[in-house]
Curated annotation (Swiss-Prot):
One Pfam family in the UniProt entry: THF_DHG_CYH
Protein's name in the database: Bifunctional protein FolD
Record lineage: Bacteria, Bacillati, Bacillota, Clostridia, Lachnospirales
Domain of life: Bacteria
Reactions it catalyzes: (6R)-5,10-methylene-5,6,7,8-tetrahydrofolate + NADP(+) = (6R)-5,10-methenyltetrahydrofolate + NADPH; (6R)-5,10-methenyltetrahydrofolate + H2O = (6R)-10-formyltetrahydrofolate + H(+)
Coiled coil (residue ranges): none
Function: Catalyzes the oxidation of 5,10-methylenetetrahydrofolate to 5,10-methenyltetrahydrofolate and then the hydrolysis of 5,10-methenyltetrahydrofolate to 10-formyltetrahydrofolate.
Length: 279
């Protein structure tokens, strides 16, 4: 039976450490402020934005919320970002994705000042990550690295398979695992013999966007399984990309959904916000 990797517990530990750091920074007159832009009222996005605000409150960072109508133009969003870039009291800016179809996400991300890009999505942040320079790391992959390290799971020299190649999780995840000296394979919709590739993984990280897609037949005995997916099943219960019930008896460690990767994403956003305060 696998050990559960408790993302809630680990994320709270991180937020408590950050809270202490923020208190010390405030004594030096350094304040933190995160501006969150949400376009439209997608229910999932609203939940994420609410959780981000709560986390800001917890660690002692001020949050500004810009809730814009679905029909807001790209130009209006870019003007708002320009204003926030110029506001020295704002250290972090994030635009909650996905954006409505008529808005070019890349253009919006590119408009955010790299020094305030606490999501770690800007070309400058990504470039710094590729060559191992300091910069803001994307929150979900950075959170997964913390989950592994704080659970005393050795990454060095291990075979890691990342299923999914999105710009937000899959690609940066593979780079961060490479930084930790894992031997990394990235799988995607064109990968042949996916099952065989996954079965070679000491650490299997799944971000494929398909509910319960990875079952026990994809997992070798004793593997560490990290589930990035989040979906609602027919009974309206949350589930991941991994079929937890079948994999839990085969893995050595596994993240649950909910309560695994999700809380870590927000903890690492707070970590980036604190980093932005110090710059």
């Amino acid at each position: 039976m696998a050990n559960l990797i408790d993302g809630k517990l680990i994320s709270t530990q991180i937020k408590d450490e950050l809270k202490e750091e923020v208190t010390e920074l405030k004594k030096k007159g350094i304040e933190g402020c995160l501006a969150v832009i949400q376009v439209g009222n997608d229910p999932a996005s609203s939940v994420y934005v609410r959780n981000k605000k709560k986390a800001c409150e917890y660690v002692g960072i001020k949050s500004l919320s810009y809730e814009l109508a679905e029909e807001t133009t790209e130009d209006e969003i870019l003007k708002l970002i320009e204003k926030l870039n110029a506001d020295s009291s704002v250290n972090g800016i994030l635009c909650q994705l996905p954006l409505p179809k008529h808005i070019d996400e890349d253009k919006v991300i590119d408009a955010i000042d790299p020094k305030k890009d606490v999501d770690g999505f800007s070309p400058q942040s990504v470039g710094a990550m590729v060559i191992g320079k300091p910069g803001f790391l994307p929150c979900t992959p950075a959170g997964i690295i913390q989950l592994l390290k704080r659970s005393n799971i050795d990454i060095d020299g291990k075979s890691c398979v990342v299923v999914g190649r999105s710009n937000i999780v899959g690609k940066p995840m593979s780079l961060l695992m490479l930084r930790e000296n894992a031997t990394v394979t990235v799988c995607h919709s064109h990968t042949k013999d996916l099952k065989d590739v996954c079965k070679n993984a000491d650490i299997l990280i799944v971000a494929i966007g398909k509910p319960k897609f990875i079952d026990a037949s994809y997992v070798k005995d004793g593997a560490v399984v990290i589930d990035v997916g989040i979906h609602r099943n027919a009974e309206n219960k949350l589930c991941g990309d991994v079929d937890f019930d079948s994999v839990v008896s085969k893995a050595s460690h596994i993240t649950p959904v909910p309560g695994g990767v999700g809380p870590m994403t927000i903890a690492m956003l707070m970590s980036n916000c604190v980093e932005a305060m110090k710059r």
